[in-house]
Regions:
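Non-catalytic DNA-recognition/assembly elements of restriction-modification systems
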Residues: 590-632, 652, 769-960
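Preference for the N-terminal adenyl/adenosyl cofactor-binding alpha/beta module
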Residues: 86, 113-345, 349, 372, ...
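Signature of N6-adenine DNA methyltransferases within the class I
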Residues: 2, 99-101, 120, 308, ...
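C-terminal substrate-recognition regions of SAM-dependent nucleic acid methyltransferases
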Residues: 138-172, 176-192, 203, 308, ...
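Nucleic acid-processing catalytic cores of prokaryotic defense/repair systems
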Residues: 1-112
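Basic, amphipathic alpha-helical recognition segments used for DNA target recognition
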Residues: 683, 712-764, 772-775, 933-960
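Mixed-charge intrinsically disordered linker/loop segments at interdomain junctions
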Residues: 73-148, 558-575
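Short, ligand-facing micro-motifs at secondary-structure edges
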Residues: 520, 693-710, 728, 732, ...
Length: 960
């Protein structure tokens, strides 16, 4: 047996159905043709492939192919983990990170080396641990600050900007697209057949570098490519381009392509090391979406879409549809660089390809794009990039050795329109087409364009804050018919804003469409949208079809390491809920509750509101004033009655139970932008910051009897001396952990964007009173040591929970102990232990007894606290014997092959991107298997799981 095979077996990969040896790569139907082609070129001994992505590759000759730059090729392929047999030891490399050696060659970054004896199933890179977030620290530490994508972005941004700014080349983007296209043809081994550019890749790369230094030679090559392949990319405005291109600019371009040009940013220029035969073209497309630049983003409010998010959307729409069909018409109404269209075209071409992944029929391949792919963009450079990306995609599905008769289709202003989506005259051509899918990431925010505003006005729709995405959301419904599914990335704020235009928009959506899925991304916004932390959601719906009893799949992603390290969307079981559409219509709060909670939280909050007064009720009853402070920026409002008074420093004056009366300045203006009734500056009052404490989402509030002015970033609840206890009680509530739960469940901003509290929302929170809380607040405000404050805060939190009868509520505890720390980045991952699992089992037992205690059927619960360091399980075995132990622990089953098979741990481990809990039934027992992370075995999960199993048993289902 070869040593590499021993390594695979010792690490546990050999039992997985997702391990593919090189000769079997084509049997992996989840893998794209591009990735299969890349794997065949890299020729690893084997690859571990999960959900269509290569996660781990195994080599026993990584450094033994002198004629092949394997390190460079693997880095271009961005394969995360490389396990290499290197004779006396086993070395692990990070395939997404590299160092540039002295000899100017790419070398993958070393992670660690092992003796063969150290390769076992407990190893950090074993089959069980490469998908275990508790075991990824070594890999995480080996990551470069930048991956290939980011290097390529920096490189292309640098040269494009230099050509535009220093050499005044207005078509610099298009020039670089041509360069990239030619490099792609060369790297693919296409015999261009001009000036020595043949199928010898290295030789052709050198010839192209020579051509690029001579303007006449370069133009001659572009004209030749236009004549040979047709297409919009090679159309030349000779007079303009000849005037703008200079010999000096071509020298700079040549030096950039050879890495001789030193980038002023100090970043590495890696262009000679890129292999465009391996780099997916959708990456180039996506990069150019970024390169269109801040100017486009600021003007058109268009932000780039991460590739893995596009994959998710296209797979669940176009991909699923093509399981039974051959093609489908797709529109992206704001196509940007065309990544949605490229991914959709790839699906169509793959479905129509022959067994080798290519399409021989040149007419058919053009027909597939001309009859199925449509896009619009307001930016002409974006249209050019889209067409470039589609052209390269067409080449990607053809044998580079048989392109003699191939002519690219002309797509500009036929399929891919340059113009305003809301210019009804110009859009008539594409509006008559029967689309199966409308996909995209439309611009967000208020844009200086007229047509979309008129479009909304004509339909009596108010786009709150001038939000252009609202207009896109409406128009795609008009273009689509009952068979059209739309899937759009939208600012999630439109789902939570409480003002009437947003409420009306949600009702309109729920009434006029069948909502298929909501993918909520707010919790992972900083991981997904780099440089733009606006919260997003993907809304997928059927046009012109209302179905209020239809169940909506609601998914709210949570932060996880896989998104950061592997660039994949991981959906955990608790992220998914199924909700009747009518419930959203009847309960507008449900949109926000579901982001971090579920049905149990919805029920709990409904009970709280019915059982307790609201803060609004207390404000009215005691004639309190609830207001925010003044705006002291320049304005015309008379402030002479406030001039010369102390105004608090919003940042330094207030914290939890803390008031710094020395943190102030003097108001010296006679007029300001906005004043407020002067009574609110007269103590006593509770002052609290508008911005939440981002470490735990609590409100920073303090009671004081000192008079001050304060700005709008500080709110107040003002009363009289007779209201002191009420104010102290309110101060305690605002600072409590329970109110951070309310903030996350009911506040439109908390956990979404900017983390603020709005007074209109706060007024609706449930209110309770306790003299114990009042005393705690008084003590808290006088305490001085950190230790004393921490102990008092714990007591205060428990006191408030008791006031609401929630001291033992598992769902509130889950949000406070897990959801909020996850969101705030303070959560410490850990494994569950026997004590935790016994508590889980006892809750399960209690609920089971409530339903079946008198049935004469008894049961035992076996606890398996650690299976392969990755999973834990409980098995409930039914019996008519009441003498057996009710709950017991089984310590080690790692070598019990039949039990591992019964528990389906291999199948579970191979589906980690869409993690599932296994609930498997047999004749007299059932088993629950989940990841070993403590959060999955929390008491709240025990309650949820118990009722899932009960439903399955009572409804006669074999699974749940």
């Amino acid at each position: 047996m070869r040593t590499i095979e021993k390594i695979i077996r010792r690490l546990g990969y050999h039992n997985s159905e997702k391990l593919f040896y090189l000769s079997d790569i084509d049997k992996c139907v989840d893998l794209s043709w591009h990735d299969r082609r890349v794997l065949r070129e890299l020729a690893p001994y084997a690859a571990y492939i999960v959900d269509g992505s290569v996660l781990t590759v195994f080599f026993d000759d990584l450094n033994d192919r002198p004629d092949v730059d394997l390190h460079g090729k693997i880095w271009n392929a961005q394969m995360p983990i490389v396990i290499s047999d290197e004779g006396n030891y086993v070395k692990i490399y990070n395939g997404k990170s590299m160092d540039l050696g002295i000899e100017k060659k790419i070398r993958l970054r070393d992670i660690i080396s092992y003796d063969l004896s150290q390769c076992d199933e407990e190893n950090e890179f074993s089959y069980w641990n490469v998908t275990n977030s508790l075991s990824l620290d070594l890999y995480e530490r080996s990551m470069c600050k930048k991956n290939l994508n980011e290097f390529l972005i920096d490189n292309l941004r640098y040269i494009t900007k230099k050509l535009k700014d220093e050499f005044k080349i207005s078509f610099a983007n298009k020039l670089m697209l041509r360069v990239l296209f030619i490099r792609y043809l060369i790297d693919r081994g296409v015999n261009i057949g001009y000036m020595g550019l043949g199928d010898n890749v290295k030789q052709s790369q050198e010839i192209f570098l020579s051509i690029i230094q001579n303007k006449n030679d370069f133009w001659a090559l572009v004209k030749y490519l236009k004549e040979r392949f047709n297409g919009n990319l090679f159309e030349i405005d000779e007079e303009k381009e000849d005037a703008e291109i200079t010999d000096a600019s071509l020298v700079v371009l040549h030096d950039f392509l050879t890495a001789k040009e030193e980038m002023r940013t100090g970043q590495l220029c890696l262009f000679p090391f890129y292999d465009f035969n391996i780099i997916p073209i959708e990456l180039i497309s996506n990069i150019y979406e970024i390169l269109l630049g801040k100017e486009k983003q600021n003007r058109d409010k268009a932000f780039y879409t991460p590739e893995y998010l596009v994959d998710y959307i296209v797979n669940r729409t176009v991909g699923n549809y093509l399981i039974k069909e051959n093609e489908c018409k797709v529109l992206d109404p704001s196509c940007g660089s065309g990544i949605f269209l490229v991914k959709s075209l790839q699906k169509i071409l793959e479905h129509n390809a022959e067994s080798n992944g290519f399409l021989k029929d040149k007419e058919k391949i053009n027909k597939l794009v001309e009859e199925n792919i449509y896009g619009v963009d307001y930016n002409e450079e974006a249209v050019d990039v889209t067409i470039f990306s589609l052209y390269v995609t067409l080449f990607d599905y053809q044998d580079p050795k048989s392109l003699e008769d191939f002519r690219l289709p002309l797509l500009k202003n036929k399929n891919i329109l340059y113009g305003d989506f809301f210019d009804e005259e110009n859009m008539k051509a594409i509006e008559k087409i029967d689309y199966k899918f409308i996909l995209g990431n439309p611009p967000w925010g208020s844009v200086n364009q007229h047509n979309y505003k008129k479009y909304c006005d004509d339909r009596n729709v108010i786009a709150q804050d001038g939000e252009i995405s609202v207009a896109f959301l409406l128009k795609v419904q008009e273009i689509g018919d009952v068979d059209t599914e739309c899937s759009l990335i939208l600012p999630s704020k439109i789902l939570y804003k409480g003002k009437s235009p947003s409420v009306a928009l949600r009702k309109r959506l729920l009434t006029n469409t069948q909502l298929e899925q909501v993918l909520e991304l707010s919790a992972v916004r900083k991981q997904i949208f780099k440089g733009a932390i606006a919260p997003a959601a993907v809304l997928s719906f059927q046009c012109q079809k209302s179905a209020l009893n239809h169940k909506v799949e609601y998914i709210s992603l949570k932060p996880n390491k896989y998104l950061k390290l592997f660039g994949v969307i991981m959906i955990e079981p608790d992220d998914v809920k199924y909700v009747k559409q009518t419930l959203f219509l009847e309960n507008d709060d449900l949109w926000k509750i579901l982001v971090y909670g579920g049905y149990w939280d919805f029920e709990l909050l409904s009970i709280m509101r019915n059982k307790f007064k609201s803060i609004r009720d207390v404000v009215i009853e005691h004639k309190l004033i609830l207001k925010k402070g003044l705006q002291d920026s320049d304005g015309s409002k008379d402030a002479s009655h406030l001039t010369g008074r102390k105004i608090l420093d919003s940042d330094k004056a207030i914290d939890h139970f803390y008031f710094n009366d020395n943190a102030y300045s003097m108001l010296n203006k006679l007029t300001i932008r906005r004043t407020v009734i002067p009574e609110i500056y007269q103590a006593p009052y509770v002052l609290f910051k508008k911005g939440l404490d981002c470490t735990d989402y609590t409100i920073r509030a303090v009671y004081t009897e000192k008079d001050f002015l304060y700005r709008e970033t500080i709110n107040c609840i003002k009363g009289s001396e007779a209201d002191k206890k009420i104010l102290l009680n309110l101060c305690g509530l605002l600072n409590s952990s329970l109110f951070s739960y309310f903030n996350l469940m009911l506040g439109s901003s908390a956990g979404i964007e900017r983390e603020q509290i709005f007074l209109k929302e706060l007024e609706d929170y449930p209110y309770a009173y306790s003299d114990e809380l009042v005393e705690l607040v008084q003590t808290m405000q006088q305490s001085e040591t950190i230790e004393e404050k921490e102990e008092l805060q714990k007591n205060l939190n428990q006191c408030v929970l008791r006031m609401y009868g929630l001291q033992d509520n598992s769902f509130v505890d889950y949000v406070l102990s897990t959801q909020i720390p996850l969101l705030c980045g303070t959560y410490q991952e850990k494994k569950c232990d026997v004590k935790m699992m016994k508590e889980y089992a006892s809750i399960f037992s209690k609920i089971w007894d409530e339903h079946f205690g008198q049935s004469g059927v008894y049961y035992t619960i076996a606890i398996y606290p650690d299976i392969k360091g990755k999973f834990a399980a409980i098995r409930i075995k039914l019996s008519f014997d009441d003498s057996v132990d009710n709950i017991y622990v089984v310590d080690n089953i790692n070598e019990d092959v039949s039990l591992l098979a019964d528990f389906m741990v291999y199948q579970l481990n191979d589906c980690f991107y869409q993690a599932k809990n296994v609930v498997e039934f047999s004749e007299d027992s059932f088993v629950i298997v989940k990841s070993i992370e403590a959060k999955n075995w929390h008491p709240a999960m025990a309650i949820k799981d118990s009722y899932k199993v009960l439903n399955a048993v009572l409804l006669g289902k074999g699974d749940c």
